[in-house]
Swiss-Prot record:
Record note on cofactor: Binds 2 magnesium or manganese ions per subunit.
Keywords: ATP-binding, Cell shape, Cell wall biogenesis/degradation, Cytoplasm, Ligase, Magnesium, Manganese, Metal-binding, Nucleotide-binding, Peptidoglycan synthesis
Main localisation: cytoplasm
Lineage: Bacteria, Bacillati, Actinomycetota, Actinomycetes, Micrococcales
Record pathway: Cell wall biogenesis; peptidoglycan biosynthesis
Gene assigned in the entry: ddl
UniProt-listed Enzyme Commission number(s): 6.3.2.4
PROSITE patterns: ATP_GRASP, DALA_DALA_LIGASE_1, DALA_DALA_LIGASE_2
Role description: Cell wall formation.
Protein name (record): D-alanine--D-alanine ligase
Classification via HAMAP family: Dala_Dala_lig
Protein species of origin: Tropheryma whipplei (strain TW08/27) (Whipple's bacillus)
Record: residues binding Mg(2+) 2: E308, N310
One GO BP: cell wall organization
Segments forming domain ATP-grasp: 138-339
InterPro entries according to UniProt: ATP-grasp (IPR011761), ATP_grasp_subdomain_1 (IPR013815), D-Ala_lig_Van_CS (IPR000291), D_ala_D_ala (IPR005905), Dala_Dala_lig_C (IPR011095), Dala_Dala_lig_N (IPR011127), PreATP-grasp_dom_sf (IPR016185)
Length: 347
């Protein structure tokens, strides 16, 4: 029997999505794994959760069972200190940081686990940080010859000092409509379509409420497609392209992703998508991703253009990633991810 320490919740805006992903995993994980659920509250407290509520998008509550991480590297054991002072130890083989957004998939928790020499599922510090920061994703991938949209970066600390200058440079460089988004947020938080110049300052302010910097780029009239990747017995396996039919918004926002009905079209039926698996694999390896990821593209007349990379995609029942592999059940997708990570631990 193998033991999996499942980290979920976290301090980001995607706390409830992580909770839902963890709940789905707990319901479908195979019997070969004993799961140790450790939630992170919105304030950053690590707590041992003997159960996870059946609420789809719940919240990790401080139940008094605080988790103490090992004080020396290589020790795969946590101490659970209960409210009345009693404590007990729990051993594990592998950590699954099923966390979304900042302080979860941006390299921070990965750095802590690396420092403690604790094996974990998913990409390491560099790949996680580079994929989370859309500015550096574009820099790295464009240097590797992967098509990306042109962009303009606005750092939060400079915006209020040079607002008029930024607005002029953006209007000189681009034509409307534009798309404004935080540089380091997920689940489409802080994103806005901008049709006119007058809407631009508000959109930038909105993005900066959700991230340290904002990115402005052309708003393409082009479908977005998704490619999920998973390492299977040492071989990177790409799913077919997925297109998501949704209604009620101009883009695949939080409501469409998690609240409203959607339809997955697999495979996506668009021209100019030849070679998508090679491009997605190149992105995966250029950033040094591990175990699993999702790559998002726009389909243009000249071919695929990279949008974003997600090193910790949602694993809810409604999420794109587990739905992408039509020949695999949800439990098989999870087992493949875990087997890939566990094999690397045993080497």
């Amino acid at each position: 029997m193998r033991s999996l320490l499942l980290l979920f919740g976290g301090r980001s805006q995607e706390h409830s999505v992580s909770y839902a992903s963890a709940r789905a995993l707990l319901e479908h994980i195979c019997d070969e794994w004993t799961v140790i659920p450790v939630g992170i509250t919105k304030h950053g407290d690590f707590v041992y959760c003997s159960t996870v509520s059946e609420q789809d998008y719940g919240e990790v509550i401080d139940n008094g069972n605080r988790v103490v991480w090992p004080s020396r590297a290589g020790c795969k054991k946590i101490e659970v200190v209960q409210a009345r002072g009693k404590s007990f130890f729990v051993e594990f083989d592998l950590v699954f940081p099923l966390l979304h957004g900042v302080f979860g998939e941006d390299g921070t928790i990965q750095g802590m686990l690396d420092l403690l020499d604790i094996p974990y599922v998913g990409s390491g510090v560099f790949a996680s940080a580079a994929a989370m920061d859309k500015h550096y994703t574009k820099i790295l991938c464009s240097h590797a010859g992967i098509p990306v949209l042109p962009w303009y970066l606005i750092k939060g600390h400079a915006w209020h000092k040079n607002r008029d200058s930024f607005l002029k440079q953006i209007s000189d460089r681009f034509t409307f409509p534009l798309f404004v988004k935080p540089v380091d947020a997920g689940s489409s938080f802080g994103c806005t379509f901008v049709d006119f110049f007058e809407q631009l300052p508000v959109a930038i302010e909105h993005a900066l409420q959700h991230g340290k910097s904002a990115i402005v780029e052309p708003a393409l009239d082009a479908p977005e497609v998704f490619c999920s990747l998973i390492e299977n017995n040492g071989v990177l396996q790409c799913s077919e392209l997925v297109f998501v039919k949704h209604s009620g918004s101009k883009f695949y926002d939080y409501s469409a992703k998690y609240l409203n009905p959607v339809e997955f079209v697999i495979p996506a039926q668009f021209d100019n998508t030849d070679g998508y698996a090679e491009i997605a694999s190149k992105v995966f390896f250029e950033l040094g991703c591990r175990h699993y990821a999702r790559i998002d593209f726009f389909v243009t007349e000249s071919g695929l253009v990279l949008n974003e990379i997600n090193t910790s995609p949602g694993l809810t029942q409604k999420s794109i990633f587990p739905s992408s592999f039509k020949s695999m059940q949800y439990s098989q997708v999870i087992e493949t991810i875990l087997a890939s990570a566990y094999c690397q631990v045993k080497r």
